Amino acid sequence: MAVTWEEYFRLVFSEKVQPKPLEQTGDDSSVLQLILEKKEELAVADLGLQAQKKEYRSTIESVNQRWRELEQKGQELQGSVISYDKFLKEVEARRAARKAIEERKITGNLDAELRRLRTQLKELRLQRARLQRKVQRLEPCARILKRALEKRPVFEEVSDLVARFETLVSTKAALKLEEQKRLVEMESTRAQLLSLQSEKQDEMLNLNQQRTQLVEQLEAAREHRQQWESKWTEILNSASEKTLLLGRARMAVLNLYHLVRLQQGRRQTLDVRDVEGQLEEVKRFIMNISATLAKLALAQPTATAS
C-alpha cells in the first residue's frame, strides 16, 4: 500500500517527538527550562527528520535509476532477442539456400557424370566394334603366322615371332634414320667442301692477282733500279771527271804557287793540300804584278813626254 509523503513524515515525527505532560510546578524557571528543552528536542528531531528525508530521497533516486537501468536492459534484451531471432532466421535461410545449391550441384554433377559415362560407354562400344573388325581383318595374318611358326620351330609362340618382326622393323627404322643422318651429314660435308673450294678458288684468284701486281711492281722496280744505276754511273763518271779536273786544277795551282814562291825567292810554307791558301798567294802575287805593270804603264808616257 502506498504511503503519502505527509503521512510518512507525520508518522516519523510522531514517533520521534512525543509530547510529555507538563508537571504542575509553581516555579516559572522550571517551566522555562522545560520549554527550552522541548525546543532543543524539536530542533534535534527536525535535524533527524531532514536527514531521513535526504536519505529517503537518495534511496528513491537510486531505486528510480535502477528501475530505469532495468527497463533499458529489458529493452536491450528484447532487441537482442529480436535480433537473435532474425539472425536465426537468416542462418536458417542461408543454410536452406546452401543446401539447395549443394543439392543442385550434386544433381548437376551426377547428371554430368552420367552423361560422361554414357559417352565413354558409347566410345568403348565403338572401339570394341573397331577392334572386332580389325581382328576379322587380321585373322588371315594370324593363320599365316601360325603356319610360319610351325615351319620355324625357333619361335615357340606367335608373340615371339611378332616381337622378332617388330625388332627387325625397329632396327630397319633405326638404320634408315641413321642413313638419313649420314646423308644429311654427307650433304653438309659436300656443301662445306664446295664452299671451301669456292673460297680457295677465290683465294687463288686473289693470290694470282696479287702475284701479277707484285710482278708488275718488281718489273717497275727493276726498271727504276736500272734508271738509277744509269744515273749513278753517270754521276760516278761525272764525279771521276770532276775529280780528275780537280786534281789537275790542284796541280796547276800548286805549280803556280811554286812559280810564285820561286819568283819571290821564298820557301814553301803552306801545306800541299791547302789549295785555297795557295790560290790566295797566287792572287796576291798577280795583283801585285798587275799593280806594278799599271804603275810602269803610267810612268812610261810621262818619261816619253820628258
UniProtKB/Swiss-Prot annotation:
GO terms for cellular component: axonemal doublet microtubule; motile cilium. InterPro entries: CFAP_domain-containing (IPR051147), DUF4200 (IPR025252). Keywords: Cell projection, Cilium, Coiled coil, Cytoplasm, Cytoskeleton. GO terms for biological process: cilium movement; inner dynein arm assembly. GO terms for molecular function: dynein complex binding. Residues 49-139, 197-231 form a coiled coil. It is found in: Cytoplasm, Cytoskeleton, Cilium axoneme. The keyword S-adenosyl-L-methionine does not apply. It comes from the Eukaryota. The keyword Oxidoreductase does not apply. Belongs to the CFAP73 family. May play a role in ciliary/flagellar motility by regulating the assembly and the activity of axonemal inner dynein arm. This is Cilia- and flagella-associated protein 73.
